[in-house]
Curated annotation (Swiss-Prot):
The protein's name: Long tail fiber protein Gp37
Annotated organism of origin: Enterobacteria phage Ox2
Residue ranges annotated for the Peptidase S74 domain, each copy included: 139-237
Compartments, as annotated in UniProt: Virion
Phylogenetic classification of the source organism: Viruses, Duplodnaviria, Heunggongvirae, Uroviricota, Caudoviricetes
GO biological process, one term: symbiont entry into host cell
A Gene Ontology cellular-component term: virus tail, fiber
Length: 251
């Protein structure tokens, strides 16, 4: 450990400078780390990091931050904290959490607290809306096996679905209203097209979700069926009679 007259501190284990601390920052020499550590994905399960936090053994349902920051607007307040940490649930792998919220009071007191979850299987949960320039869903035919064309009846399925306006609440447990929306109900869609509905766990409760891609496919099929019906309606009456006669007689 080296301390300069200006108060700067340098950590140099075995004579190699690893970190430098002064009154405004902490600087870590990451190049020392990369020179002696593997950079492949397959090894990361056993590799630590230049800054490494080991929480050790923890309880079955808990969350501990790894790093946290906080700021407040001068003369206005709105003390906000952001942290990255690990959440543990019973009998399962951990979740990476990014939490953004008030540092003035708890969520129980009505203060904001958004928790973004990153699960081990690649699933991501957001408590709010997503705003993107576009969203692309993998739909390559090479990824789809056992294909079977959807049978007729899509138009009837669509007609049986009811469209509602409703207040969307945050969760099964938290009934505070997010905003007014319009849409369909997952339970209704599940009766007509079960492939379009999935079940996920949100805040300890099972919640049904809808695949917009599947709903779009159902609408496309319904439009195709409607198009055939319109063509039939536009067909002249005598042409229809001729078609029926041609089934029984050949000229």
């Amino acid at each position: 450990v080296y301390i300069t007259n200006a108060g700067d501190i340098t950590l140099s284990p075995k004579g190699v400078e690893m970190a430098h601390v002064n009154n405004v920052r902490l600087y870590v020499h990451g190049e020392r780390w990369t020179a002696s550590q593997p950079g492949d994905w397959g090894s990361q399960w056993q590799v630590e990091a230049p800054i490494f936090v080991d929480h050790g053994y923890v309880s079955q349902d808990c969350y501990y931050p790894i790093i946290k920051g906080r700021s407040v607007i001068t003369n206005q307040g709105f003390v906000t904290a952001v942290d990255l940490g690990i959440r543990r649930v019973n009998n399962n792998w951990g979740q990476a959490i990014i939490r953004v919220g008030s540092a003035e009071a708890s969520p129980a007191a009505g203060h904001p607290n958004a928790v973004f979850e990153f699960h081990y299987d690649g699933t991501f949960y957001s408590p709010g809306n997503g705003n993107f320039s576009d969203v692309y869903i993998r739909s390559d035919g090479r990824l789809k096996i056992n294909k079977k064309e959807l049978e007729n009846g899509a138009l009837e399925k669509v007609c049986r679905l009811k469209v509602y306006t409703y207040d969307k609440v945050k969760s099964i447990k938290d009934r505070s209203v997010i905003k007014r929306e319009v849409g369909i109900i997952a339970q209704d869609l599940e009766k007509e097209l079960p492939e379009a509905v999935s079940k996920v766990e949100v805040d300890g409760s099972d919640v049904l979700t809808i695949s917009n891609s599947a709903v779009n496919a159902l609408l496309i099929k319904a439009i195709q069926e409607m198009s055939e019906e319109i063509k039939e309606l536009k067909t002249p009456f005598f042409t229809k009679i001729a078609r029926k006669i041609s089934k029984y007689f050949k000229f």
